[in-house]
Every structure is written in structure tokens, then in C-alpha cells.
Swiss-Prot record:
Phylogenetic lineage: Eukaryota, Fungi, Dikarya, Ascomycota, Pezizomycotina
Localization, UniProt: Cell membrane
Transmembrane segments annotated in the record for this chain: 79-99, 151-171, 205-225, 236-256, 303-323, 336-356, 409-429, 438-458, 468-488, 500-520, 578-598
InterPro entries, alphabetized: MFS_trans_sf (IPR036259)
Name listed for the protein in its UniProt record: Siderophore transporter MYCGRDRAFT_70577
Chain's role: Siderophore transporter; part of the gene cluster 14 that mediates the biosynthesis of a ferrichrome A-like siderophors which may contribute to organismal virulence.
Main location: membrane
Comp. bias intervals (Basic and acidic residues): 1-11, 29-46
Length: 648
């Protein structure tokens, strides 16, 4: 075990601590003087208050015992862990391929249907499905198991790509995209929970970041995919994924089933087992046990609440997306009805969650958790800002630059490349400093500046390749804020609440993405066509304007770079995208504030900062920073500094 002075020598340098601070160590096994005992008693009381409504369930203890057996059972246990890591890498490789190219396919497909302005509806529907499916998939694994849930995810994933590839209209394409969104949701949830189960806080961000490293390879592969399939063969590109996904996901499924079998032979529970087995030590066998349990699981997942929430957001956000292009616009009775009914259902959802829900989507103990609320606010506004900017970003670059499809795809992936590089680096900084808060604040500030760099002084989006590239890189460095919010929220709850926090964070941050897509779509549909009328030559026919407004494919392939219509359209794009970037800039200011309000948890060998037990369930030593008392009333700077470094 590292001594307290060794543990803090690097963290002090990173967090800017002065010599007036001293460090003590809490330990159940070490002897202490009376002063240290008083501090230990205080810390224990804090932890007890934080977990007063939570008890260590039998299944959680069995998972920790199985983890211990894997680590200590020699070559066979280590081999199984290595295979699990390799299979997860393949799974995330598949996920990275999907994430890296489908935004481009969405833009081209909507243009092929002459409905490019409705791209926001595609992304909004996908985001809503991803959001509400997280709690559903979490509870599905409670009555089946993780590998069985993977199978369900895989089937829906493949069907979604097949439907999208064969679609003959935007409505069918949205259905297919919604199916694939369900699949992405499952991969997100299961990989995050597995990393949370197996890693201590000091390594959590690093291994979470490693899940994203396949993007470092797939970004360049996606460039070749784009070159081969965009703009005319996008259907074949989607069909390719329907074949590829089963091949890449199967190893993870078999590995988790193998872990279940090994655990059964040892009389234990693995992280691949069902949630009921992992939490309560209950093994569910046979249809007679599944069916009676389905009702209680529906209550536990708050199925009614999820349906109300999903329906409310779908009606409200899709109305905002579809109204500008509908007959009569906002005077269309259908759009007004969708909006009114959506808000009524949203009110019913709030009332149901507050008064009637037996198990609310967000438990009260989570809602009163300061660290979780701050992390959630950071994540929500981060996602909203990113989705607002990203909705038409690939379309913007596609039109304003005379680049090949390969260069276009690689440039769009620059932010992802930076994010995937900075996430593991940020994780290593967490490990070296044992803190996450200052890096989280730095990431939020860099991301805010990144949005600003993309704007010209006249409120237009820049055309400068250098500034666009710098903006892409700076936005990728916002990964430090993302991993900070993830680690901070997970550290703030005991082990058995880990999956709840991950699901709830994913639910609301993904809902925020759908709101961001809707904001961008509303701006685009309200401004773009009017700006095209103003910027294109006066002699340009209205039919031509509507055609290039509805299809980036037509604008890119039918009009030369020097064509006055193309130049006018580019100016219209810079004006519209400038407004979108300005909105993203405002939204990105919120994470800076709430990152500063996060607790400054010590990241050590503990699985969480509430019980301070490791992944094997054993108590760990946790160094903590104690401020020396000041003479007289502390200054404003001292109070601010004390609040910033506060660990609870």
C-alpha cells in the first residue's frame, strides 16, 4: 500500500495544494492516536449516512468473491479475464465502426429521400430510443443474464440495419435507425457495467477510456467505407453492418456464458449472470419462474414511467422537427395536437413519478446525491451542446470543402480521434494524481473555447480549415470532462447502485442529445432556405433552391465548386451553422460551472468512495486531505479553495 505522503506527492502538484495541508490515513487495521480516531469516526459516519438506505446484497458479495477467485485461481482465471478483455475489444470495435460512419449515412440517406432538412428527426428518434432502452435492458438482464441480453441486442441490431438498408422512405429508415439505436444502447450499458465491476476508482477512467480506443483504427477504416459507399451505395454499407455485427459480437457472448459456467461450478456468481443472481443471489430457472417475475420486473424498471417519458419526448421533439416542413407549418392541427398532448403526458409523467411510481426511474437516494446531480448536469449539457453542433456538422463540412469522401470522413472523425486519445491519457492522470476534478474542469474550459474557435467574428461559422481543425481537436479534449463526470458519479454510490447510476446518467444525457438534435433541426429548418434565397443569385429558381435545400448530394455533385449557386449555398450554410454553434457555446458554459461543484474524491484502490471497499469487497486504506485551522476568519480565497477541494 502506498503511504499517504507518496499518494499525495503527485496529486498535490496537479491540484495545486499548498504546504499548509497535511494528510492522514484511515485504516481499520492500523493503530491510531486519539486525533486520528476522531477523524476516522467522522468519515465512517459520513459513509453510513450516504448509504443508510442501501445494504450489501447477497449477490454483490458473491460477485466480489468470484472476482477474487478469478484473480487468484491461477492461469485459468487469468486466461478467462484476458479472453473477456479481448472479446470486449471486438465488441467495441463493432460499436466504433457503427458510430464512425452512420452519421454520414444518415445525412446521405435523408438526402436520397430529398428530406435532408428532416435529418434531425432521424437523430431525435434514435436518441429517444437509446435513452429509454437503457433501463429496460438493465432489467432484462435481471431476469435473463448479460450474455442473453447481448443476444437480444445483437438480433435487434442486425434487423435494424437490414430495415434501414432496404427502406424506401424516410419513415422506414427512421424505424431501422431506431432498432440500431437499441443495439448501441445495449453495448454502452453492458460494457460500462463490466468495467465498473472489475476496476478500482484509480483505474476506472483509464479502462473506460480504453473502450473507445478502437475508434483510433476504425476512423481510418470508415474513410475507406465512406469512399466506397457514399453517396450512391449507402444501402450496401448498412447491409454490410448487418453481417459484420454478429461476427464481432459473438465472442463476447460466448465468453460471458463461459464465465457463468465457471461460476456455477465454483458455486459463485459471475458478472455475466443475471442481475437477480448478482444482486440477491437468486438463480432463475424455468418458465414457471420467469413469468411470475415479469410483473415485478416491470414495476422495478418503472415501465409505465419509461413509456410516459418516451411518448412525451417523442411527441414534443418530433413535432418541433416536423412542423416546419409540414403543410401549413405550425398552423397544421396535427403538429399542435402532438405538442399539446406531449406536454400533457410529460406532466402526467412528473406526477406519476412523484406520487404513484412504486420504483421511480431515479430513486430518491440518487436524487439527493450532490455528486450525481452535478455530474448529471455536466453530462446533460455536454451532450446537448454536442448534439446541437453535430446534427448538421458532417453536412456542413461536406458542402463547404471540395474534399473527397475519404478526407471528409477522416476530418469528421478528428474529434473522435482526439477523444479516444485523451480518454486513456486522462485515465492515467487520474491514476497518477488520484484526483479527477481539476482535469474535469480543464476539459470543460477547453471544450468551451473549442466551440468559440469555430465561430467567425461576424457570427458565421468559419471556413478556415486550420480553425475548423483546432476546434475539432479542442472539442475532443472535452473527453476529460466526460470521464470525470463518469468516475465522480460512480464513486458517489455503493457497488449495488452502480448499474442504477449508469442507467440513469445514460437515460437523461441521451434525452439531452435528442433535445440538442431538435434545437439544431429547428434552427436549420427556420433559417437555411431563407438564407439560400438571400445568398444565391437572384435569378435562381425557387424549385432549384428547394432541391439543394433538401439534398446535400445534389448540391455537392450537380454544382461545381465555382458555381454561383454553390457559393451562395455555402454562405447560407455558414450563417445557419453560426447560429447553431453559438447555441452550443452557451450550452457548453454550464458544465464549466458544475464541474467546479463536484466533490474532489480520492481515487484509490476502492471500488467506490462510499463504502471504501475494493473490487473484492475488502476494506481499503483511503488517504484524505485535512486542512489546518486558520487563525481568525478565513479569507474569501481560502473559503473558495476549501470548497473546491472538499472531498464530500
Amino acid at each position: 500500500m502506498r503511504t499517504s505522503s507518496e499518494s499525495h506527492s503527485r496529486s498535490d502538484a496537479f491540484n495545486g495544494k499548498n504546504d499548509a495541508s497535511q494528510v492522514t490515513v484511515d485504516s481499520d487495521s492500523a493503530s491510531k492516536d486519539h486525533h486520528d480516531h476522531d477523524h476516522h469516526h467522522k468519515d465512517t459516519s459520513i459513509n453510513e449516512r450516504q448509504s443508510q438506505h442501501v445494504h450489501q446484497q447477497a449477490g454483490v458479495s458473491k460477485v466480489e468473491a468470484f472476482n477474487k477467485a478469478l484473480y487468484q485461481s491461477g492461469p485459468s482465471g487469468r486466461l478467462l479475464l484476458y479472453v473477456l478483455v479481448a472479446s470486449l475489444a471486438l465488441t467495441m470495435f463493432a460499436y466504433a465502426l457503427d458510430q464512425g460512419i452512420t452519421y454520414q449515412f444518415n445525412a446521405i440517406a435523408s438526402s436520397d429521400f430529398s428530406q435532408h432538412a428532416s435529418l434531425g428527426a432521424v437523430n431525435t428518434a434514435s436518441s429517444i430510443i437509446r435513452a429509454i432502452s437503457k433501463p429496460f435492458l438493465g432489467k432484462l438482464s435481471d431476469i435473463t443474464s448479460r450474455p442473453t441480453t447481448y443476444v437480444v441486442v445483437l438480433v435487434v441490431y442486425a434487423v435494424g440495419f437490414a430495415v434501414a438498408a432496404s427502406s424506401q422512405g424516410l419513415a422506414a429508415y427512421i424505424v431501422g435507425a431506431s432498432f440500431t439505436a437499441f443495439g448501441k444502447s445495449g453495448l454502452d450499458l453492458l460494457s460500462d457495467i463490466i468495467v465498473g465491476d472489475l476496476t478500482p476508482l484509480e483505474w476506472r477512467a483509464f479502462w473506460s477510456g480504453m473502450l473507445a480506443t478502437p475508434f483510433l483504427i476504425t476512423t481510418f477504416i470508415n474513410g475507406f467505407i465512406s469512399d466506397a459507399f457514399v453517396p450512391n451505395n449507402w444501402r450496401w454499407g448498412l447491409g454490410m453492418f448487418a453481417i459484420m455485427m454478429p461476427v464481432l459480437l459473438t465472442p463476447a457472448i460466448w465468453t460471458l456464458y463461459g464465465m457463468q459456467l465457471k461460476a456455477a461450478k465454483m458455486g459463485m456468481v459471475s458478472m455475466g449472470d443475471s442481475g437477480l443472481a448478482r444482486k440477491d443471489g437468486v438463480k432463475v430457472q424455468g418458465m414457471q419462474q420467469y413469468l411470475p417475475m415479469a410483473r415485478s420486473i416491470a414495476v422495478e424498471m418503472d415501465l409505465i414511467g419509461l413509456l410516459l417519458l418516451g411518448l412525451a419526448f417523442s411527441l414534443i421533439l418530433l413535432a418541433l422537427n416536423l412542423a416546419p416542413a409540414s403543410n401549413g407549418g405550425w398552423s397544421n392541427p396535427s403538429m399542435i395536437a402532438m405538442l399539446v398532448i406531449g406536454f400533457v403526458i410529460l406532466g402526467l409523467f412528473i406526477a406519476y413519478e412523484a406520487l404513484l411510481a412504486p420504483v421511480p426511474i431515479t430513486p430518491k437516494r440518487i436524487l439527493t446525491n450532490k455528486a450525481f446531480l452535478c455530474a448529471l448536469t455536466v453530462d446533460v449539457f455536454n451532450q446537448m451542446a454536442s448534439a446541437t453542433r453535430n446534427n448538421y456538422w458532417s453536412s456542413y463540412i461536406y458542402i463547404i470543402k471540395p474534399w473527397s469522401n475519404y478526407v471528409w470522413t477522416i476530418f469528421i472523425g478528428t474529434t473522435t480521434l482526439t477523444l479516444c486519445t485523451m480518454s486513456p491519457i486522462g485515465g492515467l492522470i487520474h491514476r497518477a494524481t488520484h484526483r479527477y476534478k481539476t482535469l474535469m474542469v480543464i476539459g470543460a474550459i477547453i471544450k468551451l473555447i473549442g466551440y468559440g474557435v469555430g465561430l467567425d467574428g461576424n457570427s458565421r461559422s468559419t471556413l478556415s480549415t486550420a480553425r475548423l481543425a483546432v476546434s475539432q481537436v479542442m472539442l475532443g479534449m472535452g473527453a476529460w470532462t466526460v470521464i470525470g463526470a463518469r468516475v465522480g458519479s460512480q464513486a458517489s454510490v455503493p457497488h449495488q447502485d452502480l448499474s442504477v447510476v449508469i442507467s440513469v446518467m445514460s437515460l437523461w444525457s441521451t434525452m439531452a442529445s435528442s433535445i440538442g438534435s431538435t434545437i439544431a433541426a429547428t434552427i436549420w429548418q427556420d433559417r437555411m432556405l431563407n438564407y439560400m434565397r438571400e445568398e444565391c443569385p437572384p435569378s435562381t429558381p425557387e424549385a432549384t433552391l428547394k432541391k439543394i435545400y433538401g439534398s446535400i448530394k445534389t448540391l455537392k455533385t450537380k454544382y461545381d465548386w465555382e458555381d454561383p449557386v454553390r457559393m451562395g449555398a455555402i454562405r447560407a450554410y455558414t450563417r445557419t451553422n453560426g447560429i447553431i454553434l453559438a447555441v452550443s457555446l452557451v450550452l457548453a458554459a454550464v458544465p464549466v460551472v458544475f464541474s467546479c461543484l463536484m466533490p474532489n474524491y480520492y481515487l484509490g484502490k476502492q471500488q467506490n468512495a462510499v463504502t471504501n471497499t475494493d473490487v473484492l469487497g475488502e476494506r481499503t486504506e483511503v488517504p484524505r486531505r485535512v486542512e489546518e485551522p486558520t487563525n481568525g476568519k478565513p479569507s474569501l480565497w481560502q473559503r473558495v479553495k476549501r470548497g473546491y477541494y472538499k472531498e464530500t
